[in-house]
Amino acid sequence: MIQRSAYALAVGILGAFVVWAAPSKAEPWPQRTVRVIVPLPPGVPTDLVCRLFAERLSEPWRQPVAVENRQGADGIPAVSGFVSARDDHTLLCSFPGVITINPLIYEKLPYDPRRDLVPVVSLSDNFIGIAVSAALKVNSLDDFVKLARSQPGKLNWAASPGNPLYGFAALLKSAGIEMVQVSYRDFRPALQDVGEGRIQAVATGVGVLLAQVQAGKVKLLMVHNPQRSPQAPEVPTATEAGYPELTLEGLTGFYGWRDMPADIKARIAADARAVAADPAVVERVASIGSVLRVGTPAEFAAAIEEQRAKIVAIARTIKPTQ
């Protein structure tokens, strides 16, 4: 009797332990505020797209989505902050240069581009353009190339970091022209300088050029993207202008940390696709100078790899100054 009671007690204790130790069902994501780190200043196309999606995603996620701008140094401080968080509730919303370009220009990075940044979903393709001062009185890229060839080393150019910089440097190489690069810590003065003729050419997002284009101060000659910009439909693509090798995309997208579970990545991508289906979002993104490009994590990863290979090929022939 005593033995049977002791046995029953032991079984009861063991059963209680098993129930207590059993893993609980995973909690639905997100459980708290989601942080979105952007490596650019407020108001530029990438930032505006990130903020638009952050605002819209707060509804299905039923949690606040807070955007933090950490600009400068080619996105390195922003990426470092993102990586150190090691958190499923922290996303990076960025241009692809932090993966495709930074490894080419920095001998050592405080993050591993391939391991620490996991593509979750692309959001938009921001149009990248080459524009010149209206004072040059050129009407096409061919006209500009002929002018630059006739004045080697006498014309100036500037470009915002990332793909615009590499794209313009590749144009110089492809066209066989020599120009002087002017570097700006903050690119906004460059827009004013090209509008007033102090520099002759710039490469940057189409969205930030539109006001100067509409004012007649600058002439947009080409977009690097595979398709024409809806805001400047008369402007040819790189391929149409005779430089297919200069085709680049200005992808903006969400990245997660390297151990982010697959189901969370899939959830973020699916919710982003739902946001992109709203006609008001389509219209707003177009007004920024971009087009929506929202797919799956695998599609985003493939697009990043394709762009990385193209940038590496360009980098073998040029050495632009950051």
Across the structure, where does each feature detected by a protein language model lie?
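Bacterial N-terminal signal peptides that target proteins for export
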Residues: M1-V11
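N-terminal signal peptide c-region/cleavage motif recognized by signal peptidases
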Residues: V19-P23
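N-terminal (or domain-start) structured segment
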Residues: K25-R115, P152-K154, N163-P164, G176-A201, ...
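An extracytoplasmic/periplasmic, membrane-proximal ligand-sensing/linker region
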Residues: Q31-T33, S174, A262-Q322
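Hinge/capping helix and adjacent helix->loop/strand transition within the periplasmic-binding protein
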Residues: S84-T90, L104-P189, A238-E240, L251-R284
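Short beta-strand and adjacent tight-turn residues that come in two discontinuous sequence segments
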Residues: L92-S94, S122, Y184, A203-G205, ...
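A ligand-binding cleft/hinge motif common to bilobed small-molecule-binding domains
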Residues: G97-K108, L165, A169-S174, A201-V235, ...
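C-terminal lobe and pocket-closing loops
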Residues: L209-A277, E306-A309
